[in-house]
Amino acid sequence: TNPVLDVDGNELQRGQLYYATSVMRPGGGLTLAAPKGSCPLNVAQAPFDEYSGRPLAFFPENADDDTVQEGSTLYIMFPEPTRCPQSTVWTFDREAGFVTTGGTTSKAIGPHNSRFAIRKAGDASSQPRDYQIEVCPCSTGVERPSCRMGCLGTLGLAEGGKNVLLNINNESPHTIRFVKVKEG
C-alpha cells in the first residue's frame, strides 16, 4: 500500500493535524455544522474558499501504523473541543445518510460506522495528491479484519438545510487535499 500524502508531498502521520481542503470551488475545507442548533454535530464543507476548515487528526486502525496508508481503515476526528457532549470522532449515520460526530474508535469485531478509508481520487482530472474518503464498516489493512464486508461507498457533498454535508455519493465523490496545520 502507499502512504497518503499532504500537498507538500509528506506522509500523513497518526495524530498530526491537517486541514481537508476541497478541490472543487466554491467551498472551503471540512468543518462542523449544528443541524438546527442541536447535537451531535454534522461534518460539513465550509462555505467560503478562504476558510480551511477545522483541523482533523487521523488514527490508523492498525496500531503499528504511524503513517496513514491508502485504503487502510482509520478513525477521523476533530481534536478541538465543541459545545456538544458527543465525541468528535466521525461516524456515518445510516439513518440520516450523513457523516456526523459521536463516533467511536472501538476495534470491536463486527461492522461499525466510524471506520473510514482514504483512497487516491480516480477522476481523469485528479492530481497525484487528490484523495477521496470512503465509509468502510469493516477493517482493511489490519492483521485480523473485524468482519468481511466491502466499503459502503465514497463520500460526496449533499445539501442539508443551510449546510453542505457529507453523504455517500459514488456518482460525484468529494475530492480533497490535505494541508498540514503549521505550528504556532
Swiss-Prot record:
Domain of life: Eukaryota
SMART domains to which the protein is assigned, alphabetical: STI
Swiss-Prot/TrEMBL keywords: Disulfide bond, Protease inhibitor, Serine protease inhibitor
UniProt xrefs under InterPro entries: Kunitz_inhibitor_STI-like_sf (IPR011065), Prot_inh_API-A/B (IPR016308), Prot_inh_Kunz-lg (IPR002160)
Reported effect, M24A: In 50% of the molecules
Record-annotated disulphide pairs: C39-C84, C136-C147
Gene Ontology terms for molecular function: serine-type endopeptidase inhibitor activity
Name of one Pfam family that matches: Kunitz_legume
Site (Reactive bond): L56, A57
UniProt similarity note: Belongs to the protease inhibitor I3 (leguminous Kunitz-type inhibitor) family.
Function: Inhibits trypsin and alpha-chymotrypsin.
Subunit note: Homodimer.
UniProt-recorded name of the protein: Trypsin/chymotrypsin inhibitor
Species of the source: Alocasia macrorrhizos (Giant taro)
Taxonomy of the source species: Eukaryota, Viridiplantae, Streptophyta, Embryophyta, Tracheophyta
